[in-house]
């Protein structure tokens, strides 16, 4: 799949603010320091489309990005419609709030949990949640429960092992095998990635192209 352009659409702090674009959507979820921003920037060939916060875990919004919009195609936010038919390769990438790092107040944590649930249950065109995990870390029961939560909502989950350049090839293979056993996951749905080396990019984009 060729990426022509990518643009920020909107940041939402509650479900009422979620944009209705009408094209396939792919979300990214993981710990606050798992490298979501770097991965999305790598996928769309932009250095700073997704801002990396100076304090990991402080992003509390659901951020939406539109990919491959032709210059001739305009979106009217009032009517929530495009000026013409959307091309087949146009889609939305969604950056979901990270978890497990920032010290948020109990109320704010509950608000994010509620927003995540509302997102997952109100996006009929959501095709895949890419679940990011640092390849240097051991998987946790919390991550297993999170994947089970998404599966319980009939959402396809693909695990992306990030920061693969920080470990050797053998360790990458071992981690992938261990994760497949721990999560009872098909290895084809575990992608090894490195934003720094741009590895895994083609695998992720190929999967997106198949699901659009």
From Swiss-Prot:
Its cofactor is Mg(2+). Residues 22-212 form the EngB-type G domain. Mg(2+) binds at residues 37, 59. GTP binds at residues 30-37, 57-61, 95-98, 162-165, 192-195. One of its GO terms (molecular function) is metal ion binding. GO terms for biological process: division septum assembly. Disulfide bonds: none annotated. CDD domains: YihA_EngB. It holds the Pfam family MMR_HSR1. Keywords: Cell cycle, Cell division, GTP-binding, Magnesium, Metal-binding, Nucleotide-binding, Septation. Necessary for normal cell division and for the maintenance of normal septation. PANTHER family: ENGB-TYPE G DOMAIN-CONTAINING PROTEIN, MSS1/TRME-RELATED GTP-BINDING PROTEIN. Belongs to the TRAFAC class TrmE-Era-EngA-EngB-Septin-like GTPase superfamily. EngB GTPase family. This is Probable GTP-binding protein EngB. It comes from Treponema denticola (strain ATCC 35405 / DSM 14222 / CIP 103919 / JCM 8153 / KCTC 15104). The lineage of its organism: Bacteria, Pseudomonadati, Spirochaetota, Spirochaetia, Spirochaetales.
